[in-house]
Design a protein with these regions (language model features):
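Positively charged n-region of N-terminal signal peptides that target proteins for export
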Residues: 1-7
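Bacterial N-terminal signal peptides
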Residues: 7-18
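Short S/T/G/P-rich N-terminal loop/turn motif that feeds into the first structured element of a domain
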Residues: 20-102, 106-212, 216-234
């Protein structure tokens, strides 16, 4: 858990430099193993209250639990959302000047837990935040053809929406992704209001027509390195 506040060595992908902008939807995400989900949720709510009262610029901070994929049940996440990178770095300085925010919240829970960090972004408006139970299916991918991926992602969104999927389909690009994420340089995700909507969307995605389209237009341009499903706790 001490790694939660340490600076991690990161790599910048050349692909990212071409498509990540100074004004963006930014997600600063911590992947934590060995943490009780309820304790983390409570600590996150307490930290948010202190940080917002202290002038933090983050749009929101939430915690979630991994339901499917590698190490489900033992893996939790803290996601912090910003409108741009400047706000993120401003909050980093603010948190450093107010160490009690961390010490009195996250610092009181399991210090033996391990964590990794990745910062991801895109240049689109930030989607509206959901409530507890919001469900996200994701795949970390190594993009092998940036042009083809960028051309086909909007079409993929249209294909899923036309099929009636009640999910937001989008992607985020690595701004700083460490060894735990690399060689992936992006994440494709489905975001649903609840597990029911996600299940129905996954059924649509698994249909023969959608799979044929994906294998013809998306799969040739990516290598999937990890995938999973998570649900938000707050």
């Amino acid at each position: 858990m001490n790694n939660f506040i340490k600076t991690l060595l990161v790599s910048l992908s050349l692909f990212v430099l071409t498509i990540t902008y100074s004004k963006a939807w930014v997600m600063d995400v911590w992947t934590i193993e060995g943490m009780d989900a309820q304790e983390l949720s409570d600590a996150t709510a307490a930290y948010k209250e202190k940080a917002m009262a202290g002038g933090a610029k983050m749009v929101n901070i939430r915690s979630s639990s991994k339901l499917r994929g590698d190490k489900p049940g033992d893996t939790t996440f803290v996601q912090v959302y910003y409108n741009n990178f400047s706000d993120m770095m401003s909050d980093q300085m603010l948190a450093a000047a107010n160490p009690d925010w961390f010490a009195s919240t996250y610092g009181k829970i399991n210090q033996d837990a391990s964590s990794n960090n990745a910062i991801m972004a895109n240049d689109k408006p930030m989607p509206e935040g959901g409530a507890a139970g919001q469900t996200v299916a994701y795949a970390f991918v190594e993009i092998t053809s940036g042009i083809n991926f960028l051309l086909n992602m909007p079409k993929f969104q249209e294909v899923m929406q036309s099929a009636g999927a009640k999910v937001q389909v989008d992607s985020l690009n690595c701004a700083t992704c460490g060894e735990s994420v690399l060689p992936a340089n992006a994440m494709i995700y489905f975001a649903a209001a609840n597990m029911k909507d996600m299940g129905e969307a996954m059924d649509i995605f698994a249909s023969s027509d959608i799979q044929r389209w994906v294998f013809a237009n998306i799969a040739p341009h990516i290598n999937i390195t990890d995938a999973g499903v998570l649900a938000f706790n707050n």
